[in-house]
Regions:
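Structural signal for interior beta-strand "rungs" in well-ordered beta-sheet cores
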Residues: 55, 114-323
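Terminal amphipathic alpha-helical/low-complexity segments used for targeting or macromolecular assembly
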Residues: 1-117, 122, 129, 178, ...
Length: 340
């Protein structure tokens, strides 16, 4: 059983609600639809509910609009609505989304309520059989299950859950909204659930997109030292059961990594890529964003995957270093040879 302690002076998570009239004014947009419709969160086109607001920043995503259940959709000014949904027309939907992400970010002060004499927020749920070592900080709304070991100077942030039998070594961080399964091992200096790399460009620079999703990690997962795994922007980042990561692996926001995958040191997977089971990646290899990778793919060391993979197999793309012009010619020649 989890031990529930009392909490003092906790504000909790904000649950702000706005009318579409408010939203349109905030993002300097034109509202088409019901000005009194209320929304309380952001959501993707595929998963948004009636109390969510979503956005479309590219024509390639407009095909999702017809099935979208969002309370309103932010679109470009030249968009021509063909139904009775609520729309907000703006110059730049992505930048408008960035503005709203800050409004709907629920975390005000993740360190509030922590007593510096023991570093555990009095509302945190900590099982009696777990061990928490000196300097570790446990935020409010965090839950630590049975037989967990949390090393020195670990931070477990708001809405984080640590499963039974999991070990988190010194100086690691579960930033926020991280669910860590049973019997996991987190080696030193890992950062789980950090902000993804999301910024909306404008003429004046970049506007930060607040990351509102979670990081969901399965059972029997091991993270080598110095791994960095971002939580989702709107939807969740998901790491499957039995995954093993070597040192200094980076996985970006919204990635889905299938069960029993193994990734060697200093690999990186860019945002919103979906990967099946049993992936193996050799050291210093990478996968760019928004791809689909099937089950049972092996990627050789130093290989960069730039297209989706639908056929299981061993994929290698290593070339000796050359001057750029020579490299470009060699690449074209190799592609022609492989098609013969």
């Amino acid at each position: 059983m989890l031990q529930q302690n009392n909490l003092q002076n906790n504000k909790g998570l904000s649950q702000a609600t706005y009318s579409l009239e408010n939203i349109a004014s905030i993002v300097d947009g034109e509202l088409i639809g019901d000005p009194n419709q209320l929304v309380s969160s952001l959501g993707s086109l595929q998963k948004a509910s009636k109390d969510c607001i979503s956005f479309v920043s590219s024509k390639k995503f407009e095909s999702f609009i017809s099935d979208c259940s969002a309370g309103a959709i932010i679109v470009k000014k030249d968009f021509k609505p063909a139904d009775n949904k609520n729309y907000i027309l703006v110059k730049d939907p992505y930048f408008a989304f960035a503005i709203l992400s800050e409004m709907f970010d629920p975390i005000e002060d993740m360190f509030e309520g922590i007593d510096l004499s023991n570093n555990i927020n009095p509302k945190a749920e900590v099982a009696e059989s777990s061990k928490i070592y000196q300097g570790a900080v446990i935020a409010d709304t965090a839950k630590i299950h049975q037989n967990v070991l949390i090393g020195p100077n670990v931070f477990v942030g708001p809405d984080c859950i640590v499963g039974e039998g999991t070990v988190i070594h010194a100086n690691s961080t579960l930033m926020r909204s991280v669910t860590l399964g049973k019997n996991c091992i987190v080696q030193n200096n890992c950062i789980l659930g950090s902000d993804g790399f999301g910024f909306a460009p404008s003429e004046d620079g970049y506007k930060k997109i607040h990351q509102l999703g979670r990081l969901i990690i399965g059972d029997d997962v091991e993270f080598g030292a110095g791994c960095t795994i971002d939580r989702g922007a709107l939807e969740d980042t998901v790491i499957g059961n039995g995954v093993k990561l070597d040192n200094q692996v980076h996985i970006a926001h919204n990635v889905i990594l299938g069960d029993n995958s193994a990734i060697a040191a200093k690999c990186a997977i860019a945002g919103s890529t979906r990967i099946g089971k049993n992936l193996q990646m050799g050291g210093l290899s990478g996968i760019i964003g928004h791809l689909e990778i099937c089950d049972n793919v092996f990627i050789g060391a130093h290989t960069l995957i730039t297209k989706s993979i639908s056929k299981p197999g061993n994929y290698v793309g290593i070339m000796p270093a050359q001057e750029h012009t020579d490299w470009a010619r060699s690449s074209v020649a190799i592609r022609k040879l492989s098609k013969k």
